[in-house]
Amino acid sequence: MNKKRRRSNPLLIILLAGAIIFLVYFNVMVVPGMNPPFVPTPTETRDPVSFEIEAQNLATEGKFIAAIEAYKQAINANPKKIDNYLNIARIQIYSGDYAQAQVSAENAVLLKNDNAEAYALLGWAKGMQQMYLEGEKDAKTAISLNPNSALAHAVYAYILALRVEAGMNELNTMDLAIEESRTALALDANLLEARWARGYVLEITSNYADAVEQYEIAVQLNSNIAQLHLALGRNYMALGQNDEAIFEFTKAYSLNPTDPMPNYFI
Protein backbone atom coordinates (compact mmCIF):
# COMPACT_ATOMS: atom_id res chain seq x y z
CA MET A 1 0.00 0.00 0.00
CA ASN A 2 1.48 3.32 -1.12
CA LYS A 3 1.81 6.16 1.41
CA LYS A 4 -0.05 9.34 0.53
CA ARG A 5 2.46 12.08 -0.43
CA ARG A 6 2.41 15.08 1.93
CA ARG A 7 1.39 18.29 0.18
CA SER A 8 3.82 21.26 0.60
CA ASN A 9 2.57 24.31 2.41
CA PRO A 10 3.00 27.31 0.05
CA LEU A 11 2.73 29.83 2.88
CA LEU A 12 5.56 28.18 4.83
CA ILE A 13 7.80 28.20 1.76
CA ILE A 14 7.17 31.90 1.21
CA LEU A 15 7.97 32.70 4.86
CA LEU A 16 11.20 30.67 4.77
CA ALA A 17 12.31 32.32 1.53
CA GLY A 18 11.59 35.75 2.98
CA ALA A 19 13.60 34.96 6.11
CA ILE A 20 16.57 33.79 4.03
CA ILE A 21 16.48 36.94 1.89
CA PHE A 22 16.32 39.14 5.02
CA LEU A 23 19.31 37.38 6.65
CA VAL A 24 21.39 37.73 3.50
CA TYR A 25 20.53 41.45 3.21
CA PHE A 26 21.25 42.05 6.92
CA ASN A 27 24.68 40.40 6.77
CA VAL A 28 25.73 42.02 3.51
CA MET A 29 24.27 45.51 3.81
CA VAL A 30 23.69 46.29 7.50
CA VAL A 31 26.26 44.48 9.64
CA PRO A 32 29.38 46.00 8.00
CA GLY A 33 28.18 49.50 8.89
CA MET A 34 27.41 48.73 12.53
CA ASN A 35 29.75 49.19 15.48
CA PRO A 36 30.39 46.18 17.72
CA PRO A 37 28.56 46.24 21.06
CA PHE A 38 30.10 48.43 23.79
CA VAL A 39 32.54 50.05 21.34
CA PRO A 40 32.10 53.86 21.20
CA THR A 41 31.19 55.47 17.93
CA PRO A 42 34.32 57.05 16.42
CA THR A 43 34.28 60.85 16.32
CA GLU A 44 35.74 62.96 13.56
CA THR A 45 39.28 64.13 14.38
CA ARG A 46 39.62 67.92 14.24
CA ASP A 47 42.39 69.37 12.11
CA PRO A 48 45.11 70.71 14.48
CA VAL A 49 45.50 73.80 12.28
CA SER A 50 41.90 74.75 13.02
CA PHE A 51 42.81 75.20 16.71
CA GLU A 52 45.66 77.51 15.71
CA ILE A 53 43.41 79.60 13.47
CA GLU A 54 40.81 79.83 16.23
CA ALA A 55 43.47 80.90 18.75
CA GLN A 56 44.87 83.54 16.41
CA ASN A 57 41.42 85.00 15.80
CA LEU A 58 40.63 85.08 19.51
CA ALA A 59 43.94 86.76 20.28
CA THR A 60 43.29 89.39 17.61
CA GLU A 61 39.93 90.10 19.24
CA GLY A 62 41.64 90.54 22.61
CA LYS A 63 40.07 87.40 24.07
CA PHE A 64 43.33 86.25 25.59
CA ILE A 65 41.95 83.67 28.02
CA ALA A 66 39.99 81.92 25.28
CA ALA A 67 42.99 82.19 22.94
CA ILE A 68 45.23 80.53 25.51
CA GLU A 69 42.78 77.63 25.84
CA ALA A 70 42.66 77.25 22.06
CA TYR A 71 46.46 77.21 21.88
CA LYS A 72 46.52 74.52 24.58
CA GLN A 73 44.26 72.41 22.36
CA ALA A 74 46.54 73.10 19.39
CA ILE A 75 49.52 71.95 21.45
CA ASN A 76 47.71 68.78 22.51
CA ALA A 77 46.88 68.07 18.88
CA ASN A 78 50.41 68.79 17.66
CA PRO A 79 52.86 68.88 20.59
CA LYS A 80 55.95 69.23 18.38
CA LYS A 81 55.03 72.53 16.70
CA ILE A 82 57.12 75.24 18.36
CA ASP A 83 55.05 78.16 17.03
CA ASN A 84 52.17 77.25 19.32
CA TYR A 85 54.41 77.41 22.41
CA LEU A 86 55.81 80.76 21.30
CA ASN A 87 52.38 82.23 20.60
CA ILE A 88 50.86 81.07 23.87
CA ALA A 89 53.86 82.37 25.84
CA ARG A 90 53.48 85.79 24.25
CA ILE A 91 49.75 85.96 25.02
CA GLN A 92 50.35 84.77 28.58
CA ILE A 93 52.80 87.65 29.03
CA TYR A 94 50.26 90.08 27.54
CA SER A 95 47.65 88.84 30.00
CA GLY A 96 50.03 89.02 32.98
CA ASP A 97 50.38 85.27 33.55
CA TYR A 98 54.17 85.33 33.71
CA ALA A 99 54.68 82.01 35.50
CA GLN A 100 52.78 80.08 32.83
CA ALA A 101 54.50 82.11 30.11
CA GLN A 102 57.80 80.92 31.55
CA VAL A 103 56.64 77.30 31.34
CA SER A 104 55.49 77.73 27.74
CA ALA A 105 58.76 79.39 26.73
CA GLU A 106 60.78 76.69 28.49
CA ASN A 107 58.87 74.06 26.51
CA ALA A 108 59.72 75.95 23.33
CA VAL A 109 63.41 75.91 24.29
CA LEU A 110 63.21 72.17 24.95
CA LEU A 111 61.78 71.67 21.46
CA LYS A 112 64.39 73.86 19.78
CA ASN A 113 67.25 75.14 21.89
CA ASP A 114 68.60 77.43 19.17
CA ASN A 115 65.42 79.50 18.76
CA ALA A 116 66.06 83.15 19.60
CA GLU A 117 62.39 84.01 20.07
CA ALA A 118 61.97 81.23 22.64
CA TYR A 119 64.85 82.57 24.73
CA ALA A 120 63.63 86.16 24.38
CA LEU A 121 60.16 85.26 25.64
CA LEU A 122 61.66 83.16 28.42
CA GLY A 123 63.80 86.08 29.51
CA TRP A 124 60.83 88.45 29.40
CA ALA A 125 58.68 86.12 31.50
CA LYS A 126 61.46 85.77 34.08
CA GLY A 127 62.14 89.50 34.16
CA MET A 128 58.49 90.24 34.86
CA GLN A 129 58.76 87.89 37.85
CA GLN A 130 61.74 89.89 39.20
CA MET A 131 64.23 87.23 38.11
CA TYR A 132 66.25 89.97 36.47
CA LEU A 133 69.65 88.31 36.14
CA GLU A 134 68.22 85.04 34.82
CA GLY A 135 66.01 86.93 32.40
CA GLU A 136 68.94 89.05 31.26
CA LYS A 137 70.96 85.90 30.59
CA ASP A 138 68.18 84.48 28.41
CA ALA A 139 67.85 87.77 26.52
CA LYS A 140 71.59 87.76 25.84
CA THR A 141 71.34 84.19 24.59
CA ALA A 142 68.56 85.26 22.23
CA ILE A 143 70.72 88.08 20.88
CA SER A 144 73.68 85.75 20.40
CA LEU A 145 71.46 83.36 18.44
CA ASN A 146 70.00 86.15 16.30
CA PRO A 147 71.67 89.58 16.57
CA ASN A 148 68.96 91.00 14.28
CA SER A 149 66.07 89.97 16.52
CA ALA A 150 64.22 93.15 17.47
CA LEU A 151 62.30 91.18 20.09
CA ALA A 152 65.50 90.00 21.78
CA HIS A 153 66.92 93.54 21.99
CA ALA A 154 63.57 94.91 23.21
CA VAL A 155 63.35 92.31 25.97
CA TYR A 156 66.95 92.95 27.00
CA ALA A 157 66.25 96.70 27.19
CA TYR A 158 63.10 96.11 29.22
CA ILE A 159 64.84 93.84 31.74
CA LEU A 160 67.70 96.32 32.14
CA ALA A 161 65.14 99.06 32.79
CA LEU A 162 63.42 96.84 35.35
CA ARG A 163 66.76 96.43 37.12
CA VAL A 164 67.25 100.20 37.21
CA GLU A 165 63.78 100.76 38.64
CA ALA A 166 64.40 98.05 41.25
CA GLY A 167 67.69 99.66 42.27
CA MET A 168 69.73 96.69 41.05
CA ASN A 169 71.55 98.59 38.35
CA GLU A 170 75.26 98.95 37.78
CA LEU A 171 77.15 101.95 36.44
CA ASN A 172 76.27 101.43 32.76
CA THR A 173 72.93 99.60 33.09
CA MET A 174 70.82 102.61 32.13
CA ASP A 175 73.02 103.52 29.18
CA LEU A 176 72.84 99.95 27.94
CA ALA A 177 69.04 99.92 28.31
CA ILE A 178 68.80 103.10 26.22
CA GLU A 179 71.08 101.65 23.56
CA GLU A 180 69.22 98.34 23.39
CA SER A 181 65.82 100.03 23.14
CA ARG A 182 67.08 102.13 20.23
CA THR A 183 68.51 99.05 18.54
CA ALA A 184 65.17 97.24 18.83
CA LEU A 185 63.35 100.17 17.19
CA ALA A 186 65.95 100.43 14.44
CA LEU A 187 65.51 96.74 13.65
CA ASP A 188 61.69 96.82 13.62
CA ALA A 189 59.77 100.02 14.30
CA ASN A 190 56.47 98.15 13.89
CA LEU A 191 57.20 95.61 16.62
CA LEU A 192 54.94 96.19 19.61
CA GLU A 193 57.57 95.01 22.08
CA ALA A 194 60.12 97.47 20.64
CA ARG A 195 57.73 100.39 21.26
CA TRP A 196 56.86 99.02 24.69
CA ALA A 197 60.49 98.69 25.76
CA ARG A 198 61.43 102.11 24.39
CA GLY A 199 58.48 103.67 26.20
CA TYR A 200 59.48 102.06 29.48
CA VAL A 201 63.10 103.20 29.16
CA LEU A 202 61.90 106.76 28.49
CA GLU A 203 59.48 106.54 31.42
CA ILE A 204 62.08 105.61 34.02
CA THR A 205 64.34 108.40 32.74
CA SER A 206 61.44 110.84 33.32
CA ASN A 207 60.93 111.57 29.62
CA TYR A 208 57.18 111.25 30.04
CA ALA A 209 56.03 113.01 26.86
CA ASP A 210 58.30 110.84 24.71
CA ALA A 211 57.20 107.76 26.66
CA VAL A 212 53.55 108.62 25.95
CA GLU A 213 54.35 108.78 22.25
CA GLN A 214 55.89 105.30 22.30
CA TYR A 215 53.12 103.78 24.42
CA GLU A 216 50.44 105.31 22.19
CA ILE A 217 52.02 103.65 19.14
CA ALA A 218 52.18 100.36 21.05
CA VAL A 219 48.48 100.64 21.92
CA GLN A 220 47.70 101.29 18.26
CA LEU A 221 49.50 98.05 17.42
CA ASN A 222 47.51 96.15 20.05
CA SER A 223 44.83 97.87 22.11
CA ASN A 224 43.98 94.80 24.20
CA ILE A 225 46.96 94.69 26.57
CA ALA A 226 46.10 96.00 30.03
CA GLN A 227 49.73 96.67 30.98
CA LEU A 228 50.15 99.05 28.05
CA HIS A 229 47.12 101.11 29.05
CA LEU A 230 48.37 101.15 32.63
CA ALA A 231 51.78 102.41 31.49
CA LEU A 232 50.19 105.04 29.27
CA GLY A 233 48.02 106.18 32.18
CA ARG A 234 51.04 106.51 34.49
CA ASN A 235 52.76 108.81 32.05
CA TYR A 236 49.67 110.90 31.40
CA MET A 237 49.40 111.34 35.16
CA ALA A 238 53.05 112.39 35.38
CA LEU A 239 52.28 115.04 32.75
CA GLY A 240 49.25 116.26 34.71
CA GLN A 241 46.79 114.99 32.09
CA ASN A 242 44.50 113.41 34.66
CA ASP A 243 41.43 112.87 32.46
CA GLU A 244 43.50 110.94 29.93
CA ALA A 245 45.17 109.02 32.74
CA ILE A 246 41.85 107.97 34.29
CA PHE A 247 40.58 106.86 30.88
CA GLU A 248 43.63 104.61 30.42
CA PHE A 249 43.44 103.21 33.96
CA THR A 250 39.75 102.41 33.43
CA LYS A 251 40.57 100.69 30.15
CA ALA A 252 43.32 98.68 31.84
CA TYR A 253 40.88 97.56 34.53
CA SER A 254 38.27 96.51 31.97
CA LEU A 255 40.87 94.36 30.21
CA ASN A 256 42.21 92.78 33.39
CA PRO A 257 39.87 93.19 36.41
CA THR A 258 42.09 90.94 38.56
CA ASP A 259 44.93 93.48 38.55
CA PRO A 260 44.60 95.91 41.50
CA MET A 261 46.98 98.50 40.02
CA PRO A 262 44.49 100.43 37.82
CA ASN A 263 42.19 100.99 40.81
CA TYR A 264 45.19 102.02 42.89
CA PHE A 265 45.97 104.83 40.45
CA ILE A 266 42.34 105.81 40.01
Regions flagged by a language model, labelled:
Residues G62-E69, S95-N107, Q129-T141, V164-T183, ...:
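Structural signature of tandem alpha-helical TPR/SEL1-like repeats
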Residues M1-D47, Y132-L133, K137-P147, L151-A161, ...:
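Long, contiguous interaction/recruitment modules in multidomain scaffold/adaptor proteins
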Residues P48-V49, I82-D83, A116-A120, A150-A154, ...:
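Helix-start (N-cap) detector for alpha-helical repeat units in TPR-like alpha-solenoids
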Residues N87, L121, V155, A197, ...:
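Canonical tetratricopeptide repeat
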Residues R90, Y158, Y200, R234-A238:
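Alpha-helical adaptor scaffolds
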Residues R46-D83, N87-D97, M128, L162-A166, ...:
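Alpha-helical segment of the N-proximal tetratricopeptide repeat
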